[in-house]
């Protein structure tokens, strides 16, 4: 597809066309009315979670406004307890598939980036008055709406920012995951200083402890199936 065309700097956009509603057999683009009907009648919970990140970026103004309204309407509809049940099930499946990893696994695992983002997307879906898209704005909005306690929001904001800072630095410096045994002393010092830690060991310990606390917050907010 043209969206995934290779360029000198890599793929234009990494788009998996298999994720469109009709799979490999369906059209790449569909009518707005069909999109609205699919979201209202057929979409699964995980698709509505993904919709919390949607933004209209280009198009004729009337079409953009209509699409934005469809997204708002879908995310504003009442949700029953089955929505949280679906989210908890998704979280369990992700944990089983990805495992926990070590302190330098920034993206996957309990209390890491994807886990926190799943919580925030759930909050956005269950709190129609919160219209934010970015994680930082979502945390503030969900705390303001009372969906997150202030201390929970403060920890999630701080920890997510820390994880993303380390992730951005290591992605610029390395071709793969960070390993303190192989990354070199210069990168280790830079990472520690960027996070306000004395050394790389202290940063690793902080990431592990803060991830454990974030996971506990997520479990408290999402509840259980009992």
What name fits each language-model region?
Residues 1-226:
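A nucleotide- and high-energy phosphate-metabolite-utilizing enzyme signature
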């Amino acid at each position: 597809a043209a969206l995934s065309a290779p360029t000198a700097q890599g793929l234009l956009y990494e788009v998996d066309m298999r994720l469109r509603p009709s799979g490999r057999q369906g059209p790449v683009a569909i009518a707005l009315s069909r999109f609205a009907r699919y979201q209202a009648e057929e979409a699964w919970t995980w698709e509505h979670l993904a919709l919390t990140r949607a933004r209209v970026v280009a198009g004729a103004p009337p079409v953009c406004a209509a699409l934005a309204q469809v997204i708002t309407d879908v995310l504003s509809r009442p949700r029953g307890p089955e929505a949280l049940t679906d989210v908890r099930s998704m979280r369990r499946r992700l944990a089983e598939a990805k495992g926990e990893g070590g302190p330098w696994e920034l993206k996957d695992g309990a209390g890491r980036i994807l886990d926190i983002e799943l919580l925030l997307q759930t909050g956005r879906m269950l709190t129609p008055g919160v219209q934010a898209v970015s994680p930082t704005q979502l945390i503030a909005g969900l705390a303001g709406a009372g969906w997150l306690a202030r201390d929970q929001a403060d920890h999630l904001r701080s920890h997510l920012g820390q994880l993303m800072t380390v992730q951005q630095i290591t992605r610029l410096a390395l071709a793969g995951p960070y390993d303190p045994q192989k990354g070199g002393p210069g990168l280790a010092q830079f990472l520690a200083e960027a996070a306000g830690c004395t050394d790389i060991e202290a940063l690793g310990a902080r990431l592990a402890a803060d991830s454990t606390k974030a996971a506990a917050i997520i479990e408290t907010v999402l509840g259980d199936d009992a």
